[in-house]
């Protein structure tokens, strides 16, 4: 038994070392500075992936169930006012599903896009980093959009329109209640959106400096006239 345990511990240690070594080898052809940046970016993007996935699946499922339930209730309800309320609720829920399906949070994919560029040389490493930095900027913009007045105005506007249709068009007071619930749910969804990307980008820029365009520089040649001849120059 002790021999078995010793062998198991050795296997775990060697396995862990191999994983760490494999990570170093994968960036062995990158410069030290680029490799350090890559590790930071990839780690943060992957760290935010699980919550973004849970958030997306949770809200998509919530609105999907709401669409089905409200549609069934609308089809079986005999009262015209209540039926209108269910129809409006189904439409709003289906809108929520459509928005999430068409525009999922970028953080949901983690660093997957970076994996499409193998770090085979410094140029490829810089391209991989460029993609990662762009993902971080995109995630940060999506995080900041939680505070956009346009986003909150849209939540209020859509639910207000639904409330007016039901309450005024069908003389059904429950339309106002549905409006309030809809606004509340919309705000919870907005503020629970993956929110750490701004902090990640700020920390990255404080540690490494502002994000940079790592695309390869082009070499250009210049010719300028001089008295009695020409001057040649090269810019890179």
What are these regions (language model features)?
Residues 63-96, 100, 167-170:
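Long, highly hydrophobic alpha-helical transmembrane signal-anchor segments
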């Amino acid at each position: 038994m002790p021999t078995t345990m010793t062998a198991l511990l050795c296997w775990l240690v060697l396995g862990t070392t191999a994983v760490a070594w494999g990570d170093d080898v994968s960036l062995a052809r990158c410069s030290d500075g680029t490799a350090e940046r890559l590790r930071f970016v990839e780690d943060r993007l992957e760290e935010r992936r699980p919550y973004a996935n849970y958030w997306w699946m949770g809200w998509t499922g919530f609105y999907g169930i709401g669409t089905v339930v409200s549609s069934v209730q609308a089809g079986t309800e005999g009262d015209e006012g209540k039926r209108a309320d269910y129809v409006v609720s189904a439409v709003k829920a289906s809108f929520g599903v459509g928005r999430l399906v068409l525009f999922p949070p970028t953080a949901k994919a983690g660093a997957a896009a970076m994996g499409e560029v193998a770090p085979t040389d410094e140029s490829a490493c810089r391209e991989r980093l460029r993609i990662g930095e762009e993902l971080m900027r995109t995630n940060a913009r999506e995080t900041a959009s939680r505070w956009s007045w346009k986003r909150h105005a849209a939540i209020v506007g859509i639910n207000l329109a639904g409330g007016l249709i039901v309450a005024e068009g069908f003389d059904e007071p429950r339309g106002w209640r549905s409006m309030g619930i809809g606004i509340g749910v919309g705000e919870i969804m907005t503020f629970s959106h993956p929110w750490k990307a701004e902090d990640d980008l700020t920390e990255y820029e404080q540690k490494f400096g502002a994000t940079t365009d790592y695309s390869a520089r082009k070499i250009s040649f210049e010719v300028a006239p001089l008295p009695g001849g020409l001057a040649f120059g090269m810019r890179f």
